[in-house]
Amino acid sequence: MIFDLKVNGQRKADGISTVSPVFSWECGTERQFTVQMSSNPKFQSAVMYLDTRNCYCIYDGVPLQAGKTYYWRVRSRVGEWTESQFTTI
């Protein structure tokens, strides 16, 4: 089970100013995850899509736009998505 999603250590991540946010989550015993981030809440066009064995990842893609809400989600290899969002400044 994946829970407690955070961006830069914050659960309610409004006002993220960094261009390389750190996404983290509590992951129980799972050790393989897929992470997606999008500017669309339906994830129709992913800004980030990666697989990791860690309970965190660092965004290193194109610069994020100021004043925009981004949506992100994570799941274990066979699990359901757990979703969150954050806003940049």
Predicted regions: what is each one?
Residues E26, R75-R77:
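A generic structural motif
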Residues M1-G28, S84-I89:
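Pro/Thr/Ser/Gly-rich low-complexity, intrinsically disordered linker/stalk tracts
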